[in-house]
């Protein structure tokens, strides 16, 4: 599965919820703002423009624009590094404030049922669409997931 497939399998209704959490300040801090602005074809990146662009973004994901999917996922996740670090710490993946540490094989830490354990631990602490996206992104990135993981009641 490609990264665009993670978005697609989670459903169009979750995309606006993910976009709502994008932090312009964090994009600028991590020097991703200009790249993201260029990739999204927005004259200015703000919450209103992101909300309005959601249908266009969905179309690009449907077209399997992987560079766009990568930049979009970076913008979403960099805006929530506290959650990323918390999940990685919980499942035992070595990291430095949410960024992978120099572990030769971080996927060894993704033991059977890690998705369910992470979901149950954090579903009431972070926005559920965001947590669900990160669990699936991590599974795609490290575990090579071919199918999106969904909790029983999501």
Residue ranges and their predicted role:
Residues 11, 147-148:
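Aromatic-enriched hydrophobic runs in primary sequence
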Residues 1, 150-154:
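Short intrinsically disordered terminal tails
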Residues 21-146:
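Acidic, low-complexity, intrinsically disordered interaction modules
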Residues 1-33:
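Short terminal alpha-helical segments
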């Amino acid at each position: 599965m490609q990264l665009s497939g993670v978005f697609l399998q989670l459903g169009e209704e979750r995309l606006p919820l993910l976009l709502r959490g994008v932090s312009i300040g964090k994009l600028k801090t991590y020097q991703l703002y200009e790249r993201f602005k260029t990739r999204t074809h927005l004259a200015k990146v703000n919450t209103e423009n992101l909300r309005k662009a959601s249908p266009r973004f969905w179309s690009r994901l449907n077209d399997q624009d992987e560079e766009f999917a990568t930049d979009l996922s970076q913008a979403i996740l960099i805006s929530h590094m506290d959650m990323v670090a918390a999940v990685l710490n919980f499942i035992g993946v070595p990291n430095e404030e949410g960024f992978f540490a120099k572990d030769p094989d971080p996927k060894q830490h993704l033991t059977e049922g890690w998705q369910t354990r992470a979901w149950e631990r954090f579903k009431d602490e972070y926005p559920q669409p965001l947590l669900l996206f990160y669990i699936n992104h991590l599974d795609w990135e490290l575990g090579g997931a071919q199918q999106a993981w969904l909790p029983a009641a999501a």
